[in-house]
Amino acid sequence: MPVSCLVVGSLRALEVRCSDAELFSSWRDVDVVIVPTAAAFTSLEAAAVACATPFSSRDARVESLMLKDRSTVDDAYFVRRLREADVVVLSDGSSLHARSVWRSSPVGEAIGAARCLVAVGATASVLGTTMIDPRGGAPTTGLGYRDGLVITTTTPPEQLARTRSLLDDDVVLAVVGEDGALDYDGVTWRASGDVVATRGPRVVTLD
C-alpha cells in the first residue's frame, strides 16, 4: 500500500483523498474493513455506511465489523479479517470509548498491525503513544499504533493552548481540521489541507 496510515479530519476529507489517483493508485479492488467502534454512542450502522461511501467508486470490497464493546475483542473472525484486510478504517466518534475497547486486546493488536490504517476525525488521537483527552485537552496514554506525532482535532483556543503547555517542547502536535489530512509512509508524516503542526509554541512543517 502507498501509505501506512491516513488521518482525515472528516469523511469529506476522506472523499478527497480517495479521489487522489496518484496517492491511491492501487486502491482498486482492495479489501476494506471498517471498524465503527467509536460511534457506539450514536449509531455503528450509520457510521459504517458513511465510512464505506468514499470507497464505493474504487471497486473495493467493504465489510464492517460491528465491534461495540469488549465482549467481542477476542472474536477470531474479527481478528482474522483485520489482519488480512488491505485497508482498515476507524470511524469518527468517541476516542476514549475506542481506546477502552481496543486496548490490550487481540482486536486492538490486529488494528495496530493493519497494512494501511485510516482514522477519521477524533478517533485519530488514539493512534500515537500519547493521545489528547477531549474532555480537557490533557495528554494521556494512546495505543501506539502509529507514532511520531500527537494528533488531535480542532478544539477551542483555550483548550488547545492548555494542550500545548502540557506537552514537552520536543513533541510535535498536529491539529487536524475538518478538511485536513495526514499521510504516513512508515517513516515520515506529511500534512495537507487544514492541519497545523507545532513543536512547543512554534509552528513547524511536516515533511
Features from the language model and the residues they span:
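A residue-level signal for conserved active-site and pocket-lining positions in enzyme catalytic cores
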Residues: 32, 88, 121, 182
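Short amphipathic alpha-helical segments and helix-helix/interface helices
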Residues: 52, 78-79, 104-111, 163-164
